[in-house]
């Protein structure tokens, strides 16, 4: 039985914080990579081991429990937002919003323009469905089209994945920005807008590179067969009312972002508009539209690609992600409120005097966490908690430093062959990580340019100097 009033606590040393981190990384790697399990149970084991270290340091069980609860409390807004996102995905598929985006994207495709169109197409769908949703839906369609157009699948997968992962930086509907915003205690819309000019610059560079690749490879795109595209277009137009009216929910969401409507009310408005359009434009029964918000959509278009594409959404679809977020934040809570995290990060941040070096260390740490702990959620949460206070002491706003964290921890995960993000992409697209990695331009250009801007212009642009 754990004593309720232990003697004076032992001093928390660097080795204690490092041990808690190394144990989680080791358990995550063994379970996820070697045994092929999901990340939830390894994180539970990591929480148990971190709690055991805290008990060894003579914290009481009540203190450990309160540490976990405080960590989870930081994530409650993110949990609510993730539920809203699930509801909105389901209703926007049923309303025809997502099908219309895909229809217009496929309509303008050509062999030479395939790579930039694949990048932009998955980017647009990713804004709504998230990176995994976009790659696992329209990404599958683009891979099939690439095969028909005789386009190297490594190039195609790189463009698809890069486009999908733009959403992990720029979309308020995706997990990474939501988690970062919750930990930094900032509005998720403000977070996504803050670095939008930088995102657009890197997207423009990526599109130019894909266009150049398409032109150079154009002569090799032989045996072109447009039947796959025609089949998808026919199935979309016969199953949904396609037209500008179905994009009204998306347009209103963009307005909400511009005028900084709080995240949860904006998402609920998006859900309501999706339900209304599903009933009015698509002729869905109101009960089916509401159930799409709960359990998602089960597509029956008769087209296998589209049925895979649209059988998603709803609160239930988000439950595994919500579980991971809660468990990760419980682990982070133990590290933060028992001093284990401070013991680990203080020796590092104390040596980083300038904003550029601190930003570079943050980006490097996020990438390292994705290597050592093969899942992006621990990488994001730990990076935010480790470096947030160091940025705050330099008077850098939460919407800026959380973007710096997410620029690495949120998107480099897909470049690591044993990370869950890469494993997922390899599984659904059928292309190895080493094949697509050279062509996922955004995923490594963006963090590099963030560091470059931080070193050269960061103190002028991002540092609010105290008067």
Where are these regions (language model features)?
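Membrane-core helix-loop-helix motifs of multi-pass transport proteins
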Residues: 6-15, 145-241, 396-467
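Membrane-embedded alpha-helical segments and adjacent helix-loop junctions characteristic
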Residues: 59-147, 302-388
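Transmembrane helix-loop junctions in multipass membrane proteins, especially transporters and channels
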Residues: 32-37, 55-59, 98, 130-134, ...
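Hydrophobic transmembrane alpha-helices of multi-pass solute/ion transporters
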Residues: 2-87, 94-112, 235-239, 251-327, ...
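Generic alpha-helical transmembrane segments of integral inner-membrane proteins
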Residues: 22-26, 30, 48, 52, ...
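Juxtamembrane membrane-interface segments at transmembrane alpha-helix termini
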Residues: 53-62, 146-153, 170-174, 277-289, ...
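Central hydrophobic cores of alpha-helical transmembrane segments
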Residues: 136-142, 160-161, 266-276, 404-405
């Amino acid at each position: 039985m754990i004593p309720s009033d232990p003697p004076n606590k032992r001093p928390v040393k660097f080795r204690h914080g490092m041990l808690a981190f190394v144990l989680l990384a080791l358990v995550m790697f063994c379970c996820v990579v070697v045994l092929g399990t999901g990340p939830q149970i390894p994180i539970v084991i990591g929480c148990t081991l971190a709690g055991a270290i805290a008990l060894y340091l003579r914290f009481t069980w009540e203190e450990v429990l309160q540490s976990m609860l405080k960590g989870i409390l930081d994530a409650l807004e993110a949990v609510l937002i993730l539920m809203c996102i699930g509801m909105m995905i389901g209703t926007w598929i049923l309303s025809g919003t997502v099908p219309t985006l895909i229809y217009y994207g496929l309509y303008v495709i050509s062999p030479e323009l395939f790579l930039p169109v694949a990048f932009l197409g998955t980017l647009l769908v990713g804004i709504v469905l998230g990176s995994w949703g976009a790659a696992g839906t329209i990404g599958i369609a683009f891979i099939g089209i690439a095969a028909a157009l005789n386009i190297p699948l490594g190039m195609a997968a790189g463009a698809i994945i890069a486009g999908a992962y733009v959403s992990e930086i720029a979309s308020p509907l995706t997990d990474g920005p939501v988690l970062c915003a919750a930990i930094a205690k900032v509005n998720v819309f403000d977070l996504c807008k803050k670095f939008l000019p930088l995102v657009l610059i890197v997207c423009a560079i990526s599109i130019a590179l894909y266009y150049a690749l398409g032109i150079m490879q154009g002569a090799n795109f032989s045996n072109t067969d447009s039947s796959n595209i025609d089949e998808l277009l026919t199935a979309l137009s016969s199953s949904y009312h396609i037209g500008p009216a179905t994009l009204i929910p998306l347009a209103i969401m963009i307005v909400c972002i511009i005028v900084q409507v709080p995240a949860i009310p904006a998402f609920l408005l998006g859900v309501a508009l999706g339900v209304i359009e599903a009933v009015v434009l698509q002729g869905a029964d109101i009960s089916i539209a509401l159930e799409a918000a709960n359990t998602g959509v089960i597509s029956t278009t008769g087209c296998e690609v589209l049925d895979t594409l649209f059988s998603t959404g709803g609160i239930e679809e988000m439950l595994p992600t919500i579980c991971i977020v809660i468990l990760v934040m419980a682990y982070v809570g133990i590290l933060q409120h028992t001093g284990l995290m401070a013991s680990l990060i203080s020796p590092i941040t104390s040596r980083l005097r300038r904003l550029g070096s601190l930003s570079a260390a943050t980006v490097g740490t996020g990438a390292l966490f994705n290597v050592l702990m093969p899942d992006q959620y621990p990488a994001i949460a730990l990076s935010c908690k480790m470096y947030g206070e160091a940025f705050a002491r330099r008077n850098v706003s939460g919407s800026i430093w959380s973007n710096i964290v997410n620029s690495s921890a949120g998107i480099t995960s897909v470049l690591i062959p044993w990370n869950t993000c890469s494993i997922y992409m390899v599984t659904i697209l059928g292309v190895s990580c080493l094949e697509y990695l050279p062509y996922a331009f955004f995923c490594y250009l963006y963090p590099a340019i963030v560091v470059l801007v931080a070193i050269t212009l960061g103190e002028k642009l991002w540092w609010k100097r105290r008067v």
